[in-house]
């Protein structure tokens, strides 16, 4: 069983912010594969289903971004999922241009507090990640204000395509090697 976790903040206030690209990608996967996100436990909102022959849990931690590791750890433990091979985390990255993807199998948090908390709760940094570019914050902007801000209309169009590509990358990570997925989507 795979756990595909999209990071974000719960609530309508944050739904369309830069920080919620993970949630939006999970919503796309949910719609595309008819997996209802209706279960609420382990500090998360999730649904179970099958994608291309693989059992999956689509997960949106409800702990707020900076505590995402609590929810993910609980789900992994409860369902006995191997985080090194069967956890895929989708999240925003300000070091990438809007719409650009970067697939990785391990690495530091790169300043992302949600990833930092996941690494803390897992005890290591080896898990599959899909970073979705949201663009660099403009000079003079507060980082929190930037990631909790909304995309421009032009950026939103680019982002819709990136959510589709991120969802495709998540599915590919269940079947293909890390190198194959990196070569196709990076």
Predicted regions: what is each one?
Residues 111-114:
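Hydrophobic alpha-helical segments within soluble ligand-binding/sensing domains
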